[in-house]
Structure formats: structure tokens, C-alpha cells
Amino acid sequence: MTRLNTIADGMSALKNAGDTGKSEVTIEPASKLLGAMLRIMQDAGYIAGFEFIEDGRGGQLKVHLTGKINKCGAICPRFSVQLDEMEYWEKQYLPGKNFGLMILSTSHGVMSHVQARREGIGGELLGYVY
């Protein structure tokens, strides 16, 4: 089966596994962008860790969950966000101020909206988690 949006598939797999109380989930096919998003979620404490498994068909990401994900998802289409527009998008996707993360792709790499604001740069919205 062809996957059209691996980020959306991966984020929905995380949410579904968290809702059913699973401790780990396997996401396939893997991508570098999804791996970078998982690294940000791991740094924030939403997941315990993840590992890449090569299977000859695009690879898999095995994610170890902590049970802290209430909701996560991909943002489609990927909106371009400037620094002064960040608060508007926070209100759209996050339930409260200083609660949750939006993940952005910037010219300095993939990072959370908090880090992007600290560095004074904008980017494209990829997803959110809280």
C-alpha cells in the first residue's frame, strides 16, 4: 500500500497506541523527518525513546511510549509561520499557553516552537503534541 503522508500516518499511530494503553508502537515506513520529530518529542518527555530498524523496505521506527501523549497530529498543509505569527498558530493547535509543542521545520533544522521563538526564526509547521 502506498503511503501518501508518512508524518500523518506516524502521528496517528502514536495517538492510537497511546489511547489504547500500549507501551510501544512500530511505525513504517520510517523517514528522517519523522525521526527528527520523534527526537524532539523524546527531549520534551512525551516518548521514552525510539530506534530505527532496517527491514529492506524503507525501515521501521519502534517507539517506546510513556503515556503522556493526550493528542498529537500532523499539520496539513504545512503552513509557513513567521516569528510574529507564532502565537496565532499556538491558539489554533495547542490547548493552552505553555502547554504542548508545535514542531517546525526551519532553516536551522527541525525544532519545537519554543526553541524557534528563542532563536528568533520561523519555519513550516509539521505537527503538534500535548
UniProtKB/Swiss-Prot annotation:
InterPro entries: Ribosomal_uS8, Ribosomal_uS8_CS, Ribosomal_uS8_sf. SUPFAM superfamilies: Ribosomal protein S8. GO terms for cellular component: ribonucleoprotein complex; ribosome. GO terms for biological process: translation. Keywords: Ribonucleoprotein, Ribosomal protein, RNA-binding, rRNA-binding. Belongs to the universal ribosomal protein uS8 family. Pfam families: Ribosomal_S8. One of the primary rRNA binding proteins, it binds directly to 16S rRNA central domain where it helps coordinate assembly of the platform of the 30S subunit. Part of the 30S ribosomal subunit. The keyword rRNA-binding applies. It comes from the Archaea. This is Small ribosomal subunit protein uS8. HAMAP family: Ribosomal_uS8_A (MF_01302_A). GO terms for molecular function: rRNA binding; structural constituent of ribosome.
